[in-house]
Amino acid sequence: MSRSFKTFLKHTAKDFHNQAVNPPVVRASTIIFKSMKHIRKTQAKAKKNPTGGHYDYGRQGTSTTYILQKILTKLEESYHVFTTPTGFGAVFLAIFSVTRPGDEIIVADPVYSPTRLLTEKFLKEFDIKTIFYNPSDLKTLNKNITKKTKLIFVENPGSNTFDFQDLNKILSIAKKKKILTAIDNTWGTPYFLKPIKLGFDMSIVSATKYYSGHSDVMGGSLAVNKKVFSKVYNAERITGLRLGPDDSYLITRGLRTLDVRLDRHSE
């Protein structure tokens, strides 16, 4: 990022075409094209550059949702950011994008209770086994890794205990065993921690919390590196887990004061 985090937040998302400080809210389920040639050309562009904001149906997004994705991708310093209707939707998308029946995942014990319910109960129905590790004793993480382990899911700090983990050590273990990693970074946000830059494959933030800042919108973001992009992209298109334009606009608005609010929180 060429500008500072704070400067970027204050000067992003402006609509220079209409000379407006804020971007317009574009609501569209159906996209208009001039001809069949035009739609085929757009579809070809989307296939060649799936992060480029090319869409032929509202479920794939509009210019309003794309603006938010571009902002968050810059903030996360990631390959791409997917936005979901809720923060937990991003958790679901991350896990289901990279796991299949017969796989195992290892999860930090003090995770957000819906995440625990998903991993401990719901995944069983898909023959995906979850093992929990003690964040204060990473030996429990290492010893539970098997040939079936596909993902290590971290929460830092923990939702229930607010404990901080040795992220570099976790990443070292994962890379040595060639296991994918995901982190719920809702408390930290990329203002304090950039997990993709650190080495994580996926980073989740509940946009409902600090991003929006006004308790009037639900949303989530899932930042990814290039390695897992295709898996998440395909899962997102199949499941339809995408944030709508109105919520995208409200989160974009809230981001302008993210640094001010978090600085005050951390005093």
Model-derived segments and spans:
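Conserved PLP-enzyme active-site core in the AAT-like
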Residues: 6-13, 80-267
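Residue-level marker of positions within ordered structural domains that often coincide
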Residues: 32, 77, 225
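Alpha-helix initiation/capping motif
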Residues: 16-18, 57, 61, 134, ...
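A generic structural signal for short, solvent-exposed coil/turn residues
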Residues: 2, 19, 49, 75, ...
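N-terminal glycine-rich, Lys/His-bearing helix-loop that initiates the first secondary-structure elements
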Residues: 1-52
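Conserved N-terminal alpha-helix of the aminotransferase class I/II PLP-enzyme fold
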Residues: 35-89, 117-121
